């Protein structure tokens, strides 16, 4: 499993995943946000588990946005409209878990945290073969994107 120090080292470089300049990631972000707005318009409370620097988090359609991020370095780059929390605080209309349900993370604990914190929607994203063992409730929509090069 990836250590906190490895995460800190990874985030020494701003936008280490190149999300802000990779067309596939920009498209996926736009797609997620469009689907979420179509489902509910604006959520009261949203939680992004593993928010990183807030690439998607900052634009979530919610009045109150919380983020859980283990890397202090990444969390320092979270935008002002996002409040960092160490654990979920109550229930959230929307819980976002993207790129996190993988073996290098404690994926079972993350999946449990997401289902426990959600009162309405859980939006998950990642490599589909790694997502299959999880049940988050009724599947509303499912989409598959090609993995970026």
Residue ranges and their predicted role:
Residues 53-83:
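Class I SAM-dependent methyltransferase SAM/SAH-binding core
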Residues 94-107:
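A short SAM/SAH-binding and catalytic strip from SAM-dependent methyltransferases
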Residues 88-94:
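A short acidic, Gly/Pro-enriched loop at the edge of an enzyme's catalytic core
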Residues 134-148:
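Conserved Class I S-adenosyl-L-methionine
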Residues 119-128:
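Conserved beta-strand signature within the Rossmann-like core of class I S-adenosyl-L-methionine
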Residues 1-38, 43-52:
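Conserved class I S-adenosyl-L-methionine
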């Amino acid at each position: 499993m990836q250590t906190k120090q490895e995460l800190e080292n990874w985030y020494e470089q701003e936008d280490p995943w190149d999300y802000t300049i990779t067309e596939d990631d920009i498209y996926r972000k736009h797609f997620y946000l469009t689907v979420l707005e179509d489902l509910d318009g604006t959520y009261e409370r949203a939680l992004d588990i593993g928010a990183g620097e807030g690439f998607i988090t900052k634009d979530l359609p919610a009045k109150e946005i919380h983020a859980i991020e283990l890397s202090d370095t990444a969390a320092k780059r979270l935008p002002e409209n996002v409040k960092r929390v160490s654990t979920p605080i109550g229930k959230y209309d929307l819980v976002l878990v993207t790129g996190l349900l993988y073996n290098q993370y404690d994926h079972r604990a993350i999946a449990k945290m997401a289902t426990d914190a959600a009162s309405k929607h859980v939006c998950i994203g990642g490599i589909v073969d790694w997502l299959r063992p999880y049940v988050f409730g009724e599947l509303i929509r499912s989409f598959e994107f090609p993995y970026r090069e």
